[in-house]
């Protein structure tokens, strides 16, 4: 019986050792799975934070470019009154040589002024046949045989924009 007992104890020891190895392996597997999960979560957080950082960088760059493009908007808008005055001076009829020379000088000044405005992104809004509330300001409506309803009849004051932003709409009369 002692041999059986010895054999039984040996078998128990082997089973116990095997179970311990198996338990240890299970613990290692569980730990490895937990670590992998933690790693995956941290990697995901890193990727999201990195993507958010890149988006912030792009947005800041876009805002910077926009601020630069529109920085002179208020100043340019104020200069439009000067432009209107120069254009009005050009439209005055001249009857003597001195007045013609002055008008020529004003025209040269106006041309230079327009080039400088254009250099800084200020552009004349092109005349459109159809009324566009994004570009035009209707001052009044008129009956017109030559125009369809909603068409621009007369430009009363030129409009200007910087890039795609209107700084002064074109003031127009519109056909009824």
From Swiss-Prot:
Keyword terms of this UniProt record: Chaperone, Cytoplasm, Stress response
Chief location of this protein within or outside the cell: cytoplasm
CDD domains listed in its UniProt record: GrpE
Disulfide bonds: none
GO cellular component terms, semicolon-separated: cytosol
GO annotation, biological process: protein folding
Region: Disordered, residue numbers: 1-30
A GO term for molecular function: adenyl-nucleotide exchange factor activity
SUPFAM superfamilies: Coiled-coil domain of nucleotide exchange factor GrpE (SSF58014), Head domain of nucleotide exchange factor GrpE (SSF51064)
Pfam families per the UniProt record, alphabetical: GrpE
Matches recorded under InterPro entries: GrpE, GrpE_coiled_coil, GrpE_head
Subcellular location: Cytoplasm
Family as reported in the entry's similarity comment: Belongs to the GrpE family.
Subunit structure: Homodimer.
Task performed by this protein: Participates actively in the response to hyperosmotic and heat shock by preventing the aggregation of stress-denatured proteins, in association with DnaK and GrpE. It is the nucleotide exchange factor for DnaK and may function as a thermosensor. Unfolded proteins bind initially to DnaJ; upon interaction with the DnaJ-bound protein, DnaK hydrolyzes its bound ATP, resulting in the formation of a stable complex. GrpE releases ADP from DnaK; ATP binding to DnaK triggers the release of the substrate protein, thus completing the reaction cycle.
HAMAP family xrefs: GrpE (MF_01151)
NCBIfam families from the UniProt entry: PRK14140.1, PRK14159.1
Name of the featured protein: Protein GrpE
Species assigned in the record: Campylobacter jejuni subsp. jejuni serotype O:6 (strain 81116 / NCTC 11828)
């Amino acid at each position: 019986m002692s041999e059986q007992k010895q054999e039984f104890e040996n078998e128990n020891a082997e089973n116990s050792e095997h179970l311990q190895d198996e338990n240890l392996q299970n613990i290692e597997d569980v730990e490895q799975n937990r670590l992998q999960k933690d790693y995956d979560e941290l990697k995901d957080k890193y990727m999201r934070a990195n993507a958010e950082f890149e988006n912030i960088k792009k947005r800041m760059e876009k805002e910077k470019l926009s601020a630069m493009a529109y920085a002179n908007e208020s100043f340019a808008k104020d200069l439009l009154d000067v432009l209107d005055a120069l254009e009005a001076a050009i439209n005055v009829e001249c009857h003597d040589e001195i007045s013609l020379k002055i008008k020529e000088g004003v025209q040269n000044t106006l041309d230079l002024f327009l080039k400088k405005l254009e250099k800084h992104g200020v552009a004349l809004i092109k005349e459109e046949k159809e009324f566009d509330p994004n570009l035009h300001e209707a001052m009044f409506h008129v009956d017109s045989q030559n125009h369809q309803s909603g068409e621009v009849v007369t430009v009363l004051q030129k409009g200007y924009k910087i890039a795609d932003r209107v700084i002064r709409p074109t003031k127009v009369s519109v056909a009824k």
